[in-house]
Curated annotation (Swiss-Prot):
It is found in: Vacuole. Pfam families: Kunitz_legume. Belongs to the protease inhibitor I3 (leguminous Kunitz-type inhibitor) family. Disulfide bonds join C80-C125, C174-C185. GO terms for cellular component: vacuole. Keywords: Aspartic protease inhibitor, Disulfide bond, Protease inhibitor, Serine protease inhibitor, Signal, Vacuole. GO terms for molecular function: aspartic-type endopeptidase inhibitor activity; serine-type endopeptidase inhibitor activity. Inhibitor of cathepsin D (aspartic protease) and trypsin (serine protease). May protect the plant by inhibiting proteases of invading organisms. CDD domains: beta-trefoil_STI_CPI-like. This is Aspartic protease inhibitor 8. The keyword ATP-binding does not apply. Residues 1-23 form the signal peptide. The record marks M143, L144 as: Reactive bond for chymotrypsin.
Amino acid sequence: MMKCLFLLCLCLLPIVVFSSTFTSQNLIDLPSESPLPKPVLDTNGKELNPDSSYRIISIGRGALGGDVYLGKSPNSDAPCPDGVFRYNSDVGPSGTPVRFIPLSGGIFEDQLLNIQFNIPTVKLCVSYTIWKVGNLNAYFRTMLLETGGTIGQADSSYFKIVKLSNFGYNLLYCPITPPFLCPFCRDDNFCAKVGVVIQNGKRRLALVNENPLDVLFQEV
């Protein structure tokens, strides 16, 4: 009997020693929480505000520069200007102010939002201030950015702002539902980069596979 008790104690000893190591001073390391989203900053280093207006300006200078503006699309029968363009140079007119409308809260990197030209307009043209991506253009073999979108709807009006590794930001088009036709939509989020194509001598914003538009945001 004494021999059995002795053997039982020997069996329990490692368990007691092992459990004693788990004290309040020696806790198991659990996976850390996801990092907080980073706010998008303007040219002055301030966080973008949904209630403020900004110009989208190119990082490049000269012919590589130019602000984003609202203009009339070639051959369009829309009653209001309905194209999203970039001026051909940073020497010239200022761009059309925009505001960024997040799903909720502030404006953060890699978060869905709507973009709207923030200008006075008649009631007929209100929807023609909201950015969206149009249908596949057969000539350019891509989709052009235009206005006529909606706010807060699961359609072609959602974008993201992503930080470049060194300086500035890119715009991404990110439809809520998988697009039927989107030649440059990639990865699990079906996002596509926004760049420019030349349309009738003007630089039109469009979805691109390479050379996206590198931009900054200047508060108005």
